Amino acid sequence: FFESFNCAACHGIIYCKVNYSKGKVSGMDLFSAGMNKHAPLADRMRPRTLDEFVGQQHIVGKGKLLRRAIETDSLQSSIFFGPPGCGKTTLASIVANTTGSEFVKLNAVTSGVKDVREVIAAAEDNLKLYGRETYLLLDECHRWSKAQSDSILPALERGIIKFIGSTTENPMVSMTGAIVS
């Protein structure tokens, strides 16, 4: 099921797929508490739960569809779209903290097909050996070429990874149709 949320506060749109049939699974990454002392202040102060997340209450407030999808671990591949600083990366991090899933963050500017293949191989192992799903957060996903975008399609179609794209550009224009669908 594909949902689109207009974000009036940041003039962006959050596109996401929601699996309504999945039961609630929650957990916390044991290593997320040990933040690097040398990380940027914004990363150290970043909200870790939906209750700490400020703003966007029309989509992540109590009882709202996106919040329910995150809390029940039924959020599928998604694209977060909006201007810098509106909470796209923070919301993706909250998804990682709220669900019991593995979370891998890549930047489209510095990552290539080889990096994606490594993530997919590790995700496939996690799924087969431990039954643990993997989210791939790709910052600035609009900067990926068609070849790079096509490299994750088989893994998405087979359910090996869940994709969260973060972009400041309209994904309907800047990304390949196969990824957006």
What residue spans do the PLM features occupy?
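Structural recognition of the conserved hydrophobic beta-strand(s) that form the central parallel beta-sheet
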Residues: 162-166
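Pre-Walker A (pre-P-loop) alpha-helix and adjacent loop at the N terminus of AAA/AAA+ ATPase modules
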Residues: 35-78, 83, 122-125
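Walker A/P-loop
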Residues: 27-34, 68-106, 153-154
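Short glycine-rich substrate-engagement loop in P-loop NTPases that contacts/grips substrate
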Residues: 61-63, 103-134
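Cysteine-centered motifs
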Residues: 7-10, 16
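Conserved D-loop-proximal element of ABC-family nucleotide-binding domains
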Residues: 145-147, 174
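Short regulatory helix/loop adjacent to the ATP-binding pocket of P-loop NTPases
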Residues: 153-154, 170-181
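Walker B catalytic acidic pair
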Residues: 139-140
